[in-house]
Amino acid sequence: RNGRLFLGGALLGVLVFVLVFGVSTLDVTNDAFCRGGYIEKDIQQHYAGWLFYRQSSAGWPLCIARGINYPDGLSVAYTDSIPLVAALLKPVANLVGGTFQYMGWFTLVCFALQGGFGALLAGLFLPGCAAPLAADLLFVTSPVLFERVFRHTSLGAQFFVLAALYFYFAARRKGQYASRGLFVLNVLAVGIHPYFLPMTYAITLALLLEYALHNRQLAGPGLYLAANFSGTALLGWTLGLLYGSASSGGQALYGYFCMNLNALWNPVGVNGVLYSRVLPAQNQVYGNYDAFAYLGLGVLIALPIAVVLLRRQLGGMLRRHWALACCCAVLTVFAISNVITANGATLATLPLPASLIKLFSIFRSSGRLFWPIYYLLMLLTLVGLARLKGRWLLAGAALLAVVQVWDVSPGMVQRSAAMQQAMQTDAFPTEMESDFWQAAQQYTAVVSMDEIQDDALHLALFAADNGMTTNDPFAARYDETALATQREALLAELAAGTVREDTLYLFAEEGAFLQAVEPVKDNAWCGRVTSTDGTCSWYVIAPGLQGQNFDALCTPYDENYPLRLADYTDALWNRGVLDETKQTVCFADSPFVRRKLEHASVLCADGKEYTIKTIDDHDAGWLMVTLDI
């Protein structure tokens, strides 16, 4: 029976995948949706990491992309490129040659395993095969699943949660603790995405605690857990997760991506997509969107009914599975975080020590850790459904599935349309449209001299496609200290008038560019490159290209290079203009700006001249000019 359930569930998952996404993503030579983006830009990051790793020389540990975070390299785990899959498929891809993307096949396997383990889990509580397979539709059409697949590709492996729950309940029924299934899941999870680790280990810990206290045996469960930790650490080390010091990534800390208290009945997905035909959109704040956990109308209706039907059994369930309940409570509290939000309001922000905030920020997208509880709530509806007998059970399971799929189908339809569109046109087209970038293909290294560059993911793809290395911090984690040290050394070289002929220097901030460019302006093409719409800018030092003329998107650094206000905003300033008087503007201090202002009597902007009254440089790094306006 288990074999039939798993096979039937897997086929159901494959069917749902094909109906929603078709088969075009299964063409490994079709990477259009990887390059152009799908729903968000993240898949561009995943694919860029794979491209860098594929062209990296063999070494140990595995999965180190030598061209990222150059010169140290970085594990593709931190570009969410599914390191275990990348390691297995790199030899295959290099043998086949040409374009090779695995995002489609990986996601298909995720759907198959979601269906397979979902059917097994349902089969633990529902008799026969028909009712569990009907109930399995809840798992293979899960809104949380569809919110992640192809968008955050590795997080589509939510079968890890279903499989962990299945192995937990199966082991409990057998009175065992040494579940081989849980052991394997805990090891493999680190090779797919680290966020699955606290989920699968929480379920494992619950099993071990319940067994240890019930049987008064600590040694066996303790050794099992130690061996499991060792296996996980070994695979993590093998795949490069412990390589270097990848500790920084983004400004958002624990509490920003918290779960809103309305998450279970809020059908709003990313980009405002509604996963419900009935329920309206609810407000959210901060990064609540990443904690999306809409249950679906079928489950929301069936869940309170199940609670009523099981009211006499719930106490016994909680006593039998006390450790699982405790682990779920901890995961829920962690998901909600210290920033408690409801609809569009922040109810409270509980103070936590900075050390705890830093520790918890390892899993800063805390709302994801609610997934085990999310799927347990679905499972609880099936336990309540099991109170029905015979044909009523099958009818109830079918009705639940029909209502659920009918309700959440708008979200699936939109995701289907988005994939079809992504195959035809770029959802996020490149901003690197200038002919400068064709000339820049000659370099072997792209160095980011400050911050993260505009259109960073297309820049990463550009570097990977042309066999370049880059230090631009586009990955989810990187070594912030090492990057700062490297940038200081490069700036010192430029200050000494030295450029590396094989290196393209990029600045995100004009002020930093103007500070660095003077000593090397005769040895490189220097200037500003923009996108067609002007939303993206790169300030470049391109050795060997001096004297060349590029298109209108390029402004060379020469005597005609224009002054620009500093793009600075705080409580007093608004994009370089002092709010209080609207008469004082600021510029980032540099030799170029001082030279321009030295004997100037007026500033000209948009064809109008404004008399300069005073120039103030008392604030280090800034030149403040008061105009007669």
Positions of predicted regions on the chain:
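Membrane-embedded helix bundles of polyisoprenyl
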Residues: 108, 112-124, 131-172, 178-211, ...
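Perimembrane helix-loop-helix junctions
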Residues: 198-229, 306-316
